[in-house]
Swiss-Prot record:
GO terms for biological process: carbohydrate metabolic process; cell division; cell wall organization; lipid glycosylation; peptidoglycan biosynthetic process; regulation of cell shape. Its EC number is 2.4.1.227. This is UDP-N-acetylglucosamine--N-acetylmuramyl-(pentapeptide) pyrophosphoryl-undecaprenol N-acetylglucosamine transferase. Its main location: membrane. Belongs to the glycosyltransferase 28 family. MurG subfamily. CDD domains: GT28_MurG. Cell wall formation. Catalyzes the transfer of a GlcNAc subunit on undecaprenyl-pyrophosphoryl-MurNAc-pentapeptide (lipid intermediate I) to form undecaprenyl-pyrophosphoryl-MurNAc-(pentapeptide)GlcNAc (lipid intermediate II). GO terms for cellular component: plasma membrane. The keyword Cytoplasm does not apply. The keyword Cell inner membrane applies. It is found in: Cell inner membrane. Gene3D superfamilies: Glycogen Phosphorylase B.
Length: 355
């Protein structure tokens, strides 16, 4: 490396599944002396979160096109052109050696702007099915990486960068050794919650009685309703919280997780080494199903598509897993994980910047 520090622009926005992996890579490279800036949108979570991590952020105006009316679709080319022009001006000022696209609407115009300026584009696809933006950008990218096999036919599988506190958890055989008593079930619907989990799990608790103890993240604004649902079936002892700030501590507590299967959730559960019941969000491209499938194939998880996520099916599944079976599943989950995903992505960014 020359005397001048290398410069990276991270393009990621919208959801934690895009932003948190980008932050992990950014911090890794900043620790090596890189200068990092972020490209995002002013009305999504990155606007608040990224500056809290000590990273400067620039904004462009762009939003998704899916589900919009005809008027919005007709205006889309002009909106994309304007966003491309904004991104291009930002990159001309910052002069990054490489840009890293981690997903979200911002990556499209940002990637095109970088390509038009001759700046190498590195892509990371977090999901088992590639999003539309990354499908387009892959044609102009210098390098494409994927978290799960199958999103792109020839891309290297590098996993998803996950938070260091999750990676620091003791291995399952250490963490779960000597545990007895009720099976500890962690229910996580994401920050928005998941209605199907909130409605079904209190009934599951009623069936399983004192063989389980549940910690249930309900999502915003429904904690009291979910608490009442548990109390209404004679199970008021279970813990319900709106959010869980320290997910690593929650994973450390749990014997099994019941949750959606967003890319980052699946990767964190594998890294922690936890068995899971996954309930994929119903989306036309079945993205969350494909995210969870490698863990089910490894014997570390069970997938219930939402129509099959019934009280009977879930209660029977949980009742059928002994502590020995759960430990075996936990070890299989950990074996599938790629704990050095952050280093792999950062290493590829560094390689591209040198060439």
């Amino acid at each position: 490396m020359s005397g001048q520090p290398k410069r990276l622009m991270v393009m990621a926005g919208g959801t934690g599944g895009h932003v948190f992996p980008g932050l992990a890579v950014a911090h890794h490279l900043m620790a090596q002396g890189w200068q990092v800036r972020w490209l995002g949108t002013a009305d999504r979570m990155e606007a608040d979160l990224v500056p809290k991590h000590g990273i400067d952020i620039d904004f462009i105006r762009i939003s998704g096109l899916r589900g919009k009316g005809v008027k919005a679709l007709l205006a889309a080319p002009l909106r994309i052109f304007n966003a491309w022009r904004q991104a291009r001006a930002i990159m001309k000022r910052f002069k990054p050696d490489v840009v890293l696209g981690m997903g979200g609407y911002v990556s499209g115009p940002g990637g095109l702007a970088a390509w038009s300026l001759g700046i190498p584009v590195v892509l990371h696809e977090q999901n088992g099915i590639a999003g539309l933006t990354n499908q387009w950008l892959a044609k102009i990218a210098t390098t494409v990486m994927q978290a799960f096999p199958g999103a792109f036919p020839n891309a290297e599988v590098v996993g998803n960068p996950v938070r260091t506190d999750v990676l620091a958890l003791p291995l399952p055989q250490v963490r779960l050794a000597g545990r007895d008593g009720p099976i500890r079930v962690l229910v996580v619907g994401g920050s928005q919650g998941a209605r199907v989990l909130n409605q079904t799990m209190p009934q599951v608790a009623a069936r399983l009685g004192d063989t389980v103890t549940i910690w249930h993240q309900s999502g915003k604004g429904v904690q009291h309703t979910v608490e009442q649902a548990y109390a209404g079936v004679g199970q008021p002892q279970h813990k319900v919280t709106e959010f869980i700030d320290d997910m690593a501590a929650a994973y450390a507590w749990a014997d099994v997780v019941v949750c959606r299967s967003g890319a980052l959730t699946v990767s964190e559960i594998a890294a922690a080494g936890l068995p899971a019941i996954f309930v994929p969000f119903q989306h036309k491209d079945r993205q969350q199903y494909w995210n969870a499938l490698p863990l089910e194939n490894a014997g570390a998880a069970k997938i219930f598509e939402q129509p099959q996520f019934t009280v009977e099916a879930v209660a029977d599944t949980l009742a059928g897993w002994s502590r020995e079976a759960l430990l075996t599943m936990a070890e299989r989950a950990r074996a599938v994980s790629i704990p050095d995903a952050t280093e792999r992505v950062a290493s590829e960014v560094s390689r591209v910047a040198r060439t």
